[in-house]
Amino acid sequence: YYVHGESISSYLSLQPREFVSAICILILVIEAVRLRTGIVVVGQREYESRQISALAWGALAVALALLIAPDGGKEGMQAGIYGAPIILGMTLVDPVMGEIKRAKQDLRAAVIAGMVISYSVWLGCHLWIGTDIIAAVLLAPLTVLGEIPSTKLIDDNATMILLPLGGLVLLLPFL
């Protein structure tokens, strides 16, 4: 999105933000049809036949992060000053924490590993693309917090993005 969004979206004569919205709406429409028919797509869990899938939750959350997170007036990857660590955090922290929770049945170990990875992502983005250090320090734990609650109402793919995104929105006036 940050590097090639302009060229990809231009194939459909759209701006990058319009393209993100259109793809998200398309995924949500397909998800509504899937739910109505009770189809379980390969890779989905059986219970997802009756509720919004992890894929749909994740797509919605990523789209919101791309649409809401400010770009700091920058271009290219530097425009991902906040969106990139939010999305990368979920992408890298979720599978590690999930596997540790499943294999070791140890939430504490999962949280510690998640914090190490999340801080690595956020502080790495501080060094790489200039993410504010205050945002990195305060928002990294929110990624991990998004993995902890076990609920069928909203998938952790969404909460791991929406919690730091919400924190960012509240923190922005101070940055």
Task: Give the role of each language-model region.
Residues 1-20, 29-175:
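Interhelical loop and helix-boundary elements at the membrane-water interface
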Residues 23-24:
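Selective transmembrane alpha-helices of multi-pass membrane proteins
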